Each structure stands twice: as structure tokens, then as C-alpha cells.
Amino acid sequence: MSTVQVPKLNTKDLLTLEELTQEEIISLIEFAIYLKKNKQEPLLQGKILGLIFDKHSTRTRVSFEAGMVQLGGHGMFLNGKEMQMGRGETVSDTAKVLSHYIDGIMIRTFSHADVEELAKESSIPVINGLTDDHHPCQALADLMTIYEETNTFKGIKLAYVGDGNNVCHSLLLASAKVGMHMTVATPIGYEPNEEIVKKALAIAKETGAEIEILHNPELAVNEVDFIYTDVWMSMGQEGEEEKYTVFQPYQINKELVTHAKQTYRFLHCLPAHREEEVTGEIIDGPQSIVFEQAGNRLHAQKALLVSLFKNVEELS
């Protein structure tokens, strides 16, 4: 086996992409591409990852469990509602106890503050598998997918059209970190969090990225390389039927994509609500790479797990 550099990360946890430098992100992506070609590398032999879920999941649960098996370890599913934490035990106490049993924690929950406390009180790595505010593992896979298509981030233009949600937040930070241009188009009142936008703009000043928040989807996708969308109603927002009317002009369809480059690629974090945020014609079309993108969750997360768990200089 050829020598491969395991990324050295200056963080115990991954809660948001703010914690990673541009160099660390690129290294993780390159390592993920290596692991994609070499799936059965027992780099985490005997390691146990606790998987705490308070939200429904397909991609996050399966990709983390499969990733740990491929790396020689084990993923242990923990239903947050069935744990004592769901009956009043503090996050702090839970963190300290789990640190004695397992080697790392992935948590998918609602409150980002709870994940921050879990990481603070744990002596083992904590990975944010999704909160209401951030989805960093998805953004890492998104960057990997873009990088595989372009082999660069310089000069690449990404448009995100839809709800300014957790996926949008992580993409803003990701784009700013790697120096990629990103335009967001949302209906009025559904813009991304102002503080996160400010953080992305500050990072962009250092990396040469361009960040723009608009309300016109046609302007947002003008001559872009990638068009990205997500569901209009995230988990926990069900019942907000008025959003369907407000978001209809933001549907990714054959008319909207004519404003992008002819070579554009379509991205979606999935699950998709077909004929709502995107038409079947687009998501199943030749320029859609959503299933390759979904597959890259596995490889990007494996790279992250190895880097956080082993924190060593070289893999041989």
C-alpha cells in the first residue's frame, strides 16, 4: 500500500467547518478520495463510535455505520429518546460517562448548544451529524463532490436556491473556507442566519471567496458551475404549508437552469421532495450528480473519523 498522509487536525471535534483551516479541508478531501479507492482499510481496528440520533436518518446512520465497519471498527446506534439523557440526565453527565465506554460520538439532534456542551465535557471526539444550525459532514461531502468534478475551488461558482437552513449555513462556511464563490437565493424572511453570514464574509475576505445573499433565483444561478437545493421544510417544520406558495418560484426546473452554465451540475443533500424544490426531470437528468454526492458522505466521514481518532502523521 502506498504511503498516504492522514490529515493532522488542530481540533478534537467537528461541530462546524469554522474549526478547520483551508489546508485541513483540502487534506481531508484528498484523503477521502484515497479511501474511496481503498474501501477496506482497517485504520480504526477495534474502535467504537457511538451514534446518537434524535432525528430521523438514512444517509447519516448508514454511512457512519458502514464507514466504521470498513475501517475495522464498530458503530453503536443509540436512540436519544431511549437514553437517560432523554429522561433528564444532563448532557454533561452523559458526555463523561460515554467517554469511558467508547472512542467517539456522532450526534444528530436539534440543539447545536447541546452538541457544543457534549463536546466540551467529552474526552473523546464529537462529530456533529446535524443540528438545526449546521450540517458540516454534508458540506464536507459536497466539497469532495465539487472537487472531484473540477479538481479546484478557485473560480468555481456555486448557487444555493431555497431555504437558508442548516445545510445552507455549512455550505456558506465551506465555500468561504476554500475560496469558492457562493450565491444564495431565498424568499424574503428565509435568509440564512445573519451571524453565520457575517462569519462567512469575514472568512471570505481572507480566502478570496465571494459570498452574496439574494432573493432572485435567476440572478443567483446566472453562469454558475453548480446549483444546489434542499427541501423547503426541514425536520420539525412540518405543517408550515404556506412555505409551498412562497418557495414555488425557487423550484429548480428546466426554465431556471437555462441561466446557469451549460455544463452546470445539480446537487441536493437528499432526501428530495420531487416536484417541490426540484423537478424529476432535473434530479434524474444527465447533469445531476446527487447520488454520487450522497455516496461521498461515506468517504468524507471516513476521512474525518480516521483523522480525529488517530491524529497521526502517516498511513503506511
UniProtKB/Swiss-Prot annotation:
Alphabetical UniProt keywords: Arginine metabolism, Cytoplasm, Transferase
Organism placement in taxonomy: Bacteria, Bacillati, Bacillota, Bacilli, Bacillales
GO MF annotation terms: amino acid binding; ornithine carbamoyltransferase activity
Pathway in which the depicted protein is active: Amino-acid degradation; L-arginine degradation via ADI pathway; carbamoyl phosphate from L-arginine: step 2/2
NCBIfam families linked to this entry: orni_carb_tr, PRK00779.1
Source organism of this protein record: Bacillus cereus (strain 03BB102)
Record protein name field: Ornithine carbamoyltransferase
Disulfide bonds: none
Places the protein is found: Cytoplasm
Reactions listed under catalytic activity: carbamoyl phosphate + L-ornithine = L-citrulline + phosphate + H(+)
GO biological process: arginine biosynthetic process via ornithine; arginine catabolic process to ornithine; citrulline biosynthetic process
The keyword Cytoplasm is assigned to this record: yes
Binding annotation for L-ornithine: N166, D230, S234, M235
